[in-house]
From Swiss-Prot:
GO terms for biological process: calcium ion transmembrane transport; Golgi calcium ion homeostasis; Golgi calcium ion transport; manganese ion transmembrane transport. It holds the Pfam family GDT1. This is GDT1-like protein 5. The chain crosses the membrane at residues 13-33, 40-60, 72-92, 135-155, 175-195, 207-227. It is a multi-pass membrane protein. One of its GO terms (molecular function) is calcium ion transmembrane transporter activity. It is found in: Membrane. Keywords: Membrane, Transmembrane, Transmembrane helix. The keyword Transmembrane applies.
Amino acid sequence: MAPSLLGGFTKSLAMTVLSEIGDKTFFAAAILAMRYPRKLVLAGCLTSLTVMTALSVSLGWVAPNLISRKWTHHVTTLLFFVFGILSLWEGFKEDGDSEELAEVEAELDANFKSNKAESKSKSKANDDKKKQQRPFVLQFFSPIFIKAFSITFFGEWGDKSQIATIGLAADENPFGVVLGGVLAQALCTTAAVMGGKSLASQISEKMVGLSSGVLFLLFGIMSYLSGPEGEL
């Protein structure tokens, strides 16, 4: 039986939300939005996450065509169990302090101060004049957009959520997975950009880790019981 669109959508939506809330890129988006125009930060982060989700789903969609569906199913099931155990372990180790938020903030602070020192030599009036003379496309793809895009892209590359998305796309309907993933990324990133540091600091990394661990294990059990053909 072919994997359903709704099944792929709901699994991808739930997995991505729990993986991204409290993630390094979530904190980065919140902090960047405090220092730069929100619309540019949101556009850069969302574009990056959409591209990353599409790439991950494409890899997962191609995998069953290169390797036996039976093997991709078993690998995906194993990944769910491994990520579930790792997430639970990380959740139990958390002491309640938002260490990742502090780490991301320190990294961005150093980068921000460096850029600020370089920009002091330029006249604000000249910058505004140049900006007005640039076409809209070049204004949109500004250094701020590129910065938000690159920080998010490289922060997500090789991340647990990316690997899980590849595995999910190999075992579920890829269109459902990409739709659920993009919607979840949009919800999380918008919340981070609009809520800023005040929202980010309220997130319990311990609870997020434990919740995502339980969800990964649940997906692993469902995948194991359904078998390669997707029948429970």
